[in-house]
Amino acid sequence: PGGWGAILVYAGHEKEMSGGEESTTNNRMELTAVIRALSALKEPCRVTLTSDSTYVVHSVTKGWVYQWREKGWRKKGGAVPNADLWQELLTAMAPHTVEWVWVRGHVGHVYNERCDALAVSYYRELQNEKTNDCTHVSATESKEKDV
């Protein structure tokens, strides 16, 4: 089981989101957090997306996800893990201009710590107070509309 958390921030307003799945991996939860955050934006935005997941941030910023798509979601050694979620992420990103920012986890980044707490809380609901690796994503939109 795992949990994910995301916080949308705009002009002093914040919207917290969280969820989880009974059967999952930390990488699927990291991707899910980003997808849910981007999908929650009401219109195309300029987004600064902050995450402690090198898996997610590097896969996009280094262009790997686009290469995987071009190769039919295959890479050396077989199928791309989580191809279903990578496809959802590309769809969720499409209307937006996204700047990707990696932050180190668990070093006091305010939104990262809060996202971690959201993910842990949801996970504990699923697991009756057990611990877990969790997901952390902060998305910031820069349009003049409510999140």
Regions found by a protein language model. Give the residues of each.
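RNase H-like nuclease fold core
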Residues: 1-45, 117, 121-135, 139, ...
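RNase H catalytic domain
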Residues: 1, 34-114, 118, 123
